[in-house]
């Protein structure tokens, strides 16, 4: 593709909770907004208030009191394509303000994404948005690129799903990828539940967003959970205040670390799954014995749900306990890990060697949506 040289590719990382979009070569996404589509709950009664039938992203968030909010991506996989199309449309035209038919677009997908999903993404890009070229990359692999490594194991935990993805010399090892349907949204729900025990009622979709904010601002991971619980019983040093939008102030104590503890003890939310530390270990154990040392020494955290302070120390402690005693364990938590998938995409799409990897519109017209399995791996 000769004409791709002068035009900046678009990188769009569609997460369950947030869309991160921008231009290849930039060091951060230009647009970050919630992956949410809101539809009015009531009929408009004011004449001349040109009400829309759907709102996307921040606008949906700000009007959340009168809307029903829907998330088209569940557990990292697109479940509602009409809403997803609205989100992409909003991304291109309102956030980035570009014509999608003029820019190649790099999309991201969850590991172990169903084949039909990839094809549908490809089809929408070429047929609805008329993209000149596109590519679909696996999220965790991009995070590893962003950390400057080609070998390591990525624990990518977002709003809807967590994955452990071992990567050796740039190739993900699909047989060893593990998926854990436990992520940020479950933590928010759990925090809603344990705040109820304190007498604070949060129930609606709009109130869930408030709890998400409490979680992001006040939660942390305890290095030693039992000890932290004991301390919190006797002292109030851990208590913090949070002001709700209506001015009411609530106090939150042990909930601060009980919430992210779910990542290490999924039984708290009734899940019979291994925690993120054990899942990471199990993933490493599914790999060839010769590469395990390289994986143990390069455990890379990525995604918004790894932003809790204390999480890297706790991971390190837990994995050291599971691994052989002589093994050197290194957990890397890059400061920009909230956006490392996007940053990796930005790096990848601007590499000169990547330019022959794009699927062009001509190739798509010739081969159909199935081309995505041949060209993107």
UniProtKB/Swiss-Prot annotation:
Q: Its GO CC terms?
A: chloroplast envelope; chloroplast stroma; cytoskeleton; cytosol; nucleus; plant-type vacuole; plasmodesma
Activity regulation remarks: Subject to negative translational control in pollen.
Q: Which SUPFAM superfamilies does this one have? A: Actin-like ATPase domain (SSF53067)
The answer on whether this UniProt entry bears the keyword Hydrolase reads yes
GO biological process per UniProt: root hair cell tip growth
Q: Does the keyword Acetylation apply?
A: yes
Tissue-specificity statement: Strongly expressed in nearly all vegetative tissues, and levels remain high in older tissues. Little or no expression is detected in mature pollen sacs, ovules, embryos or seeds.
Keywords on record: Acetylation, ATP-binding, Cytoplasm, Cytoskeleton, Hydrolase, Nucleotide-binding
Places the protein is found: Cytoplasm, Cytoskeleton
GO molecular function annotations of the record: ATP binding; copper ion binding; hydrolase activity; mRNA binding
Record-listed E.C. numbers: 3.6.4.-
Coiled-coil segments on the chain, per record: none
Q: Which PROSITE patterns match?
A: ACTINS_1 (PS00406), ACTINS_2 (PS00432), ACTINS_ACT_LIKE (PS01132)
Tell me the residues on which N-acetylalanine occurs. Answer: 2
Under InterPro entries, the record lists: Actin, Actin/actin-like_CS, Actin_CS, ATPase_NBD
PANTHER family annotated for this entry? ACTIN
Question: Which purpose does this protein serve, as stated in its record?
Answer: Actins are highly conserved proteins that are involved in various types of cell motility and are ubiquitously expressed in all eukaryotic cells. Essential component of cell cytoskeleton; plays an important role in cytoplasmic streaming, cell shape determination, cell division, organelle movement and extension growth. This is considered as one of the vegetative actins.
Q: Which family does it belong to?
A: Belongs to the actin family.
Q: What else is known?
A: There are 8 actin genes in A.thaliana.
Self-association state and partner proteins as the record states:
Polymerization of globular actin (G-actin) leads to a structural filament (F-actin) in the form of a two-stranded helix. The binding of profilin to monomeric G-actin cause the sequestration of actin into profilactin complexes, and prevents the polymerization.
* The name this protein goes by in its record: Actin-8
Q: What lineage does the source organism belong to?
A: Eukaryota, Viridiplantae, Streptophyta, Embryophyta, Tracheophyta
Q: Gene encoding this chain? A: ACT8
């Amino acid at each position: 593709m000769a004409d791709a040289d002068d035009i900046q590719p678009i990188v769009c990382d569609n997460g369950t909770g947030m869309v991160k979009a921008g231009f290849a070569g930039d060091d951060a996404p230009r647009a970050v907004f919630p992956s949410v589509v809101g539809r009015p709950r009531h009929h408009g009664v004011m004449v001349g208030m040109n009400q829309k039938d759907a709102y996307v992203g921040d606008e949906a968030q700000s009007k959340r009191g009168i809307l029903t909010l829907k998330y088209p991506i569940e557990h990292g996989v697109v479940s509602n394509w009409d809403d997803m199309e609205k989100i992409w449309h909003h991304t291109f035209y309102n956030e980035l303000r570009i014509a999608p038919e003029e820019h190649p677009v790099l999309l991201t997908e969850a590991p172990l994404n169903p084949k039909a999903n990839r094809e549908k993404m490809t089809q929408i890009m070429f047929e609805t948005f008329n993209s000149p070229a596109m590519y679909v990359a696996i999220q965790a692999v991009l995070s590893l690129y962003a950390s400057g490594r080609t070998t390591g194991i990525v624990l990518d935990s977002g709003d809807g799903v967590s994955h452990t993805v071992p990567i050796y010399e740039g190739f993900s090892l699909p047989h060893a990828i593990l998926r854990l349907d436990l992520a940020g949204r479950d933590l928010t729900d759990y925090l809603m539940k344990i705040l109820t025990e304190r007498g604070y009622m949060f129930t609606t979709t709009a109130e869930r967003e408030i709890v998400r904010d409490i979680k992001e601002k006040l939660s942390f991971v305890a290095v030693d959970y039992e000890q932290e619980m004991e301390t919190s019983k006797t002292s109030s040093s851990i208590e913090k205040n949070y002001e709700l939008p209506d001015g009411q102030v609530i106090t939150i104590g042990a909930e601060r670390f009980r919430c992210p503890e779910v990542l290490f003890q999924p039984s708290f939310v009734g899940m019979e799954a291994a925690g993120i530390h054990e899942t990471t270990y199990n993933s490493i154990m599914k790999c060839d014995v010769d590469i395990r040392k390289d994986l143990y020494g390069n455990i890379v955290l990525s995604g918004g749900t790894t932003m809790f302070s204390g999480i890297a120390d706790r991971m390190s402690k837990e994995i050291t306990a599971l691994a052989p005693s002589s093994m050197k364990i290194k957990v890397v938590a890059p400061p920009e890990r909230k956006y490392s998938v996007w940053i990796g995409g930005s790096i990848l799409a601007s590499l000169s060697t990547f330019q022959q990897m794009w699927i062009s519109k001509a190739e798509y017209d010739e081969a159909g949506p199935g081309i995505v399995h041949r060209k993107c791996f």
